[in-house]
Amino acid sequence: MGDALIRDAAVLRDIAPADAAICAGLARAVGWPHRPEDWEMAIGLGRGVVATLGEEVVATALWWPYGEHHATLGMIIVSPEHQGAGIGRQLMQAVLAQAEGRSLLLNATVAGQPLYEKLGFVVCGAIRQYHGEVTAVPVPVLAGGAALRPAGLADLPVLEQLDQAATGLPRGPLLRAVLEAGEGTVLMRGGEAAGFALLRRFGRGLVIGPVVAADLTDAQTLLAHGLQGRQGQFVRADIEDGSPLGAMLTAAGLKPVDSVNSMVRGSLPRPSGPFKRYTLASQALG
């Protein structure tokens, strides 16, 4: 079937939780490690579309609203057999219509970036993925009277405040979902929360993120604490390309792998600071 016939035959519909297992298989076909559980979380937090040919799901695209003015896009996949037929553009146009009126953020694969540029996205940064088995566990250094304690659901209001100060986005549902799926740590200083890190199962092992802190030292402390007891386990972290955290992750046994360009269509969110997001929840969710 020619590209035009494939494009015309593709039927788009809203993605549903029941699609999670099928989407995980599609992700594996393009080398992505996402489990059905990872898809269930992503679908539950956002909206999106799938493209079908007959009964077969051949492409996906999702988006996640953060407040009234911004959203992130991700999980944009076209099966290898149907790439180049224009289905990716159809999907993107569908999610752009769903998210109309919002400024949009995404992390672009090399293959996807030309399409996103044609749709009005511009590069605004880069993210580097580190992953691997932990071989050396760094010791957390508690500076300036800091202390660490476990995070619970009762901490969500303050975690949301720190996260919004770091990202400029209200991401309460995301933080709740990540904490419910895993565990977290709060860095305390002077009786107040001064940073946090969340960790959950994802893909081939564990992912540490988001990590939010006021400075690099506190971020390193939270990251080191998250690696405690993880020797021999597969861990992933997504950080800004060129971040000093890369040296720490490499020393722990994680290796730098692919990088992606961060892109925006519209206006960037405006973090109020002084907090900063040092690792992502995922490249799709931000």
Task: Place the predicted regions along the sequence by residue.
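Intrinsically disordered, low-complexity, positively biased terminal segments
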Residues: 1-6, 16-17, 21, 41, ...
